[in-house]
Amino acid sequence: MSDQHTGRLAGKVVVVTGAAGGQGAAEAAALARAGARVIATDVRPEGDVRRLDVSSESDWAGLATELKESYGEIHGLVNNAGIIRRERLGEVLTADFAQVQAVNTIGPLLGIQHLAPLMPPGSSIVNVGSSAALTGYYPVAYTASKWALRGVSKIAAMELGPRGIRVNTVHPGYIETGMTAAATPAFRDATLRETPLGRSGSVDDIAPLVVFLLCDESSFITGAEIPVDGGLTAHGGVKSISDAMRTDAPAPE
């Protein structure tokens, strides 16, 4: 339980997408502990989580109407929802490519378009990218979607800055969640070999940063991109990961 009258985000209304489990649930819980009134959403809602398909413009419009009627304004948006497909360049189908773009890139764009008009000066938007957005990571649909999200974030920071609204991007590396649980052991081992800290991350490595970026303590930070990846993108060594995932690749010595 949280006390919404105290804490760093007391009195703030914050929307979190993809909040039914994993990283999104951890972010929502951390924001609530900081005093925010959290509107948790997910395409597969559970409990108090509200249903929201981030790729649906009508869903976003409906949420915006509800928020305006209930609160008048909101103060934060965490675009956390995302999906992954692991097909390589020559394998991916255009329909699957488009689906990933719809959730990972168009979803945050729609969220900003519909909810930023409800935000007063001092509000903050956090887009959850990926270390894939800083490299040539092999799953082409996922990587392209996160690179595109970087562009959306930069433009939003520029255009919303004069209104006093900040937009920043967090780039998680290999974080232990349901999404990464579906990865193969070969992928996990290859990724950890390229991670200087030598371990995977947890949702608790991400959530505190999201809280900080929504707080007044970060009031002069906008347009920033912050990797939380154990150093994976410090050297850009994703080719070995890509090579490890090839079915015709020789075993590492």
Regions found by a protein language model. Give the residues of each.
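Substrate-binding pocket helix/loop in short-chain dehydrogenase/reductase
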Residues: 88-89, 96-98, 191
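Short C-terminal tail/terminal secondary-structure segment
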Residues: 2-5, 222-253
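Alpha-helical segment proximal to the catalytic Tyr-Lys
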Residues: 117, 158-162, 219
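Catalytic loop of short-chain dehydrogenase/reductase
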Residues: 126-148, 153-162, 174
